[in-house]
Amino acid sequence: MTVTYPDERGRFGTFGGKYVPETLMSAIEELELALNDAMNDEAFIHDYKEHLREYAGRPTALTYAKNMSETLGGAKIYLKREDLLHTGAHKLNNAMGQALLAKRMGKKKIVAETGAGQHGVATATIAARFGLECKVFMGEEDMERQALNVFRMELLGAEVVPATSGSKTLKDATNEAIRYWVTHADDTFYLIGSVVGPHPYPQMVRDFQRIIGDEARAQFQEITGTLPTEVIACVGGGSNAIGTFYPFLEDDVKLIGVEAAGKGVETSQHAATITKGRVGVIHGSMTYLLQDDAGQITEPYSISAGLDYPGVGPEHAYLASTGRVKYDAVTDKEALDALKQLSVHEGIIPAVESAHALAKAFERAKQLSQEESILVCLSGRGDKDVHTLMKHFRGEGHE
């Protein structure tokens, strides 16, 4: 591969950068130096991959969804099974890499933000594994939606701190985590959960998540002798998607990112940042974000706690602007329908986030021939969503 961005200023075209206060600049520069040193150290990379192999369960399987493919009657659908990774989602790939970097830097404490709770669980897990103190900020509303994950984090020894401002969701948890980091940067590592934030975070998280796409590309070629026609992944901040897409960027493969349309992109209740947003700055990075006419960030909505972020990773913004990746949006209802279909036909209950990608894949499969194929990143399992699903499928609906 010859893809080389971001540039030395942390820019993906016009997107990205380091929009942080002076009080954080030294911590950012310390991180950047440590990251460059680590990523050029073969022993560090080996250590990272070995921990993922023997502790997290990599490589994850590539599963041919035979029943689903035959039911739809079009393209063959293959699932990259990040739901099988320890803790139940792709988040551990990144948490593992950053925790190893934190230890290398001599940090004793980890601070993180979480939306659905999966990144929080992954961070608490890895902090327990490596003997690090862990503090996780989580929106008060998300804590109610994801009470099981809150308890998991506490069971793993983490302190979960509610973010009570604004919409009480991921954006606010991120604000609180950054605020805490500013005053504790000497002994604390900020372990960000997606390809967002100031440089070098988007690049670092991508590089720790690209193991998804690297594995999937090799597995797909081994199984089929070719590459998929299309690759599809859901996009909130966008780490599972960029990790899946990155190794395919220079291949003749269509890449589709799927955002949360919530109750419809024509309403105000969605989280379709690329589809409906405008360029602005959020959490230290220039990217697309949901904002009103006065430039104030608007509150995103999705049934999925992991997709309701008002921004998006700057690399996704860049790939959208160049046209290399196509971005679309799927409603709550479409995602839940796809979740039910996969559960019934394949015996796999996906996370609601992943179900957004599945909905688009099922739609695309019917438009393609049986000789063509679609690779979907199944970014996580649906255990955390069972309460929401029970309310929905037993007739209460989701308000």
From Swiss-Prot:
Keyword hit for Lyase: yes
EC number: 4.2.1.20
Pfam annotation, one family: PALP
Pathway linked to the protein: Amino-acid biosynthesis; L-tryptophan biosynthesis; L-tryptophan from chorismate: step 5/5
Keyword Amino-acid biosynthesis among record annotations: yes
Cofactor: pyridoxal 5'-phosphate
Modification N6-(pyridoxal phosphate)lysine occurs at: 91
Signal peptide: none
Catalytic activity as recorded in UniProt: (1S,2R)-1-C-(indol-3-yl)glycerol 3-phosphate + L-serine = D-glyceraldehyde 3-phosphate + L-tryptophan + H2O
Function per UniProt: The beta subunit is responsible for the synthesis of L-tryptophan from indole and L-serine.
The protein's assembly and partners: Tetramer of two alpha and two beta chains.
NCBIfam families, per the entry: trpB
Protein name: Tryptophan synthase beta chain
